Amino acid sequence: MAYGWWRRRRRRWRRWRRRPWRRRWRTRRRRPARRRGRRRNVRRRRRGGRWRRRYRRWKRKGRRRKKAKIIIRQWQPNYRRRCNIVGYIPVLICGENTVSRNYATHSDDTNYPGPFGGGMTTDKFTLRILYDEYKRFMNYWTASNEDLDLCRYLGVNLYFFRHPDVDFIIKINTMPPFLDTELTAPSIHPGMLALDKRARWIPSLKSRPGKKHYIKIRVGAPRMFTDKWYPQTDLCDMVLLTVYATAADMQYPFGSPLTDSVVVNFQVLQSMYDKTISILPDEKSQREILLNKIASYIPFYNTTQTIAQLKPFIDAGNVTSGATATTWASYINTTKFTTATTTTYAYPGTNRPPVTMLTCNDSWYRGTVYNTQIQQLPIKAAKLYLEATKTLLGNTFTNEDYTLEYHGGLYSSIWLSPGRSYFETTGAYTDIKYNPFTDRGEGNMLWIDWLSKKNMNYDKVQSKCLISDLPLWAAAYGYVEFCAKSTGDQNIHMNARLLIRSPFTDPQLLVHTDPTKGFVPYSLNFGNGKMPGGSSNVPIRMRAKWYPTLFHQQEVLEALAQSGPFAYHSDIKKVSLGMKYRFKWIWGGNPVRQQVVRNPCKETHSSGNRVPRSLQIVDPKYNSPELTFHTWDFRRGLFGPKAIQRMQQQPTTTDIFSAGRKRPRRDTEVYHSSQEGEQKESLLFPPVKLLRRVPPWEDSQQEESGSQSSEEETQTVSQQLKQQLQQQRILGVKLRLLFNQVQKIQQNQDINPTLLPRGGDLASLFQIAP
């Protein structure tokens, strides 16, 4: 009982020793304590006749010292109102085989049929995005911001709801700048986020049963954000936070149980396509030479795709022999199996030695299924189908190049389909094997080239979106969407091609004598003449322009991304990660008091209205101090002339409904270096060479050189004046923005430039074309 408690309180005496965790260095010398004299005893008689000692309290006197810190106060507006913005959104929706796509880029897509969304996302949240979600009936505001032009941001609470079967990994970022780089999407791969200490796992109900069905995360304001009153227009486009999320697989992190291997297989074009990869019309002669060589190589026809592409052309009677149409049987090799006679074929486009094959029709022993008469069929079929396409499409069709035709062109499934009659028979491609767990990333390169580029080498100017020294399974994650944002081309999947260089494949995708050489991969469906997903319904316009693009290479990136550790293997048709948010704001201002007077005689009932009262929400973009009435604008019952003139400048709303944005607002912006920005501006506004006026202190030789340089200029004076006027207008706009920023700094309404959207900081105002 009590004795046991007292026994537990006793401690054994030990010899003093220095503790290892104690500080051994000398501490700062403390201020000496003030010496006080002896307190005087005061005796006072208590009631009852007994004395008790009483002490007098002395007031401690000392030297007055200044405070180490002062408190800076900001006067708040007269009227303040707390507001919570509560809503529900899908952080990501991942359709079947869309793991490597960015859902934030595809969230507003309307493509159907086909899988929707993506397996990773880079979402950002701003006040404008919250208002846009309110207009879509995806959230509600607990207080109105009408006539309240000031605001304060207090943070947000996020609630992530766990999926029954699929795991997720998220990462919240509040550190500016909130921009995407070439490393952002690879860092969101589950194999990379699993190594990040700031990542949060959201396990499925199957992986971790018995716990709450949601995970709550409290997120504060962004870093370097000063908590004070701002106009709503200033915080309208300021990024509050970014959410990085991806689907993952915690039960089978190193490969799906539905497959028997972790090795990825895909095909790349052989080196014969190196000089004819461009689709420009001036390269047509080179493509024709290569197509004739490929069509003359009879072993390429040992595939079932020959029947699929050329037999309907023969059965329609398009090839005649005299007055009668030829049949498909006339192109079959009828030579019996024998080892007596052989023949040689020159492999097209390379320096390989001639290939020796038997003349028999047994393809398992290097025989040819078709005879030499089939050499002319691909080109004839390509020309006929091209003319038919031109007749159907009319003036909207401008391509007249049969070398890029679907049935018999350079990229026909006859040459590129991986399924041969005998597995050792080679096609116009190379089979590549890739083991993701042997990839160290050293020497890997992933980039895109425009379809007009005439070679497969990496060029610092012409090639774009280079990702190097990363594993292929990480570099392929969200790569197409990053290229679309980086180049500004939303149709880039039809205008560019993907190239890969990697020493960790079998065989190696590199040339030791040419370090910049890349290889063009393509998907299995493209090699078989099908659309992504396996559909045989190829549009007629695409059949006339059949060549590898990012549209046909997306499945290769998908296979590479799913091969990485902890990657989601797309075992379900569609999965989604739901999230609830509660943004905390305070609206403030000095509005004019609005008095509403109603006729009491028309009220026939005393009960309240059954319809719930709706809040009037104003677009934060136009809720600025200049467009709001304040108490100081109201004098003697009337508004002042300056206030009326200021309000007349308010833009009027229109009833014209747009078709929507090209890119969703929630998608993060991409980071552009200063060099890339200067290159883009130099393309839009070329540098102006002024006609130099020779000053009088220069000699005659300098005058002669100046006159010669002026004569060599190709631009006229009027063109130079137009360019100068255009640059002066741009300079005037940026100077006005600069003065506006300086005024905000003087009013203590400035925001850290790293928190502002791209183009809103002071540094971007000085990026004038040279």
Curated annotation (Swiss-Prot):
Coiled coil: none annotated. Pfam families: TT_ORF1. One of its GO terms (cellular component) is T=1 icosahedral viral capsid. Keywords: Capsid protein, T=1 icosahedral capsid protein, Virion. Self-assembles to form an icosahedral capsid with a T=1 symmetry, about 30 nm in diameter, and consisting of 60 capsid proteins. The capsid encapsulates the genomic DNA. Capsid protein is involved in attachment and entry into the host cell. Residues 646-656 have a biased composition (Polar residues). Residues 666-681 have a biased composition (Basic and acidic residues). Residues 703-717 have a biased composition (Low complexity). This is Capsid protein. Belongs to the anelloviridae capsid protein family. The lineage of its organism: Viruses, Viruses incertae sedis, Anelloviridae, Alphatorquevirus, Alphatorquevirus homin1. Residues 645-682, 697-717 are annotated as: Disordered.
